[in-house]
Amino acid sequence: MASDVLIKSIQMHDDPVEESVSPARVGLAVKGVKPDDVGRGDMICDDSTTFGSKTEIELEFEKNPFYKNEIAENQGCLVNIGLQVKAAKFLSITPLKLAFEKPIVCKAGQIAVILKPESPTIRILGSGKIL
């Protein structure tokens, strides 16, 4: 969701602060967004940030050596980046490209973990750095 949001105040442990960095837990008083519009893993960024909302990513992928099944194009999976977990499909295997059902916020260099929750054995398919 790309929209203008005004941060009125930030608090850490009931004390007002001017700014905070990850992984601090903060409370925000905001204007321009409702609680139902925000979910786990959502980010508030200024326009100059290196993060972007993407529907496709390419990875420098390393398959989990314990995951024995094959990976095929158009196969579904879940992708974890930070606190976000989104559904995706494999567009290509070499190089590994993923298409998301809903946009995901990420930047080059972050690690993405690919999951197959329906797998009866190993559920972590592998991981890779976002290119």
Where are these regions (language model features)?
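C-terminal effector/interaction modules appended to NTPase cores
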Residues: 1-131
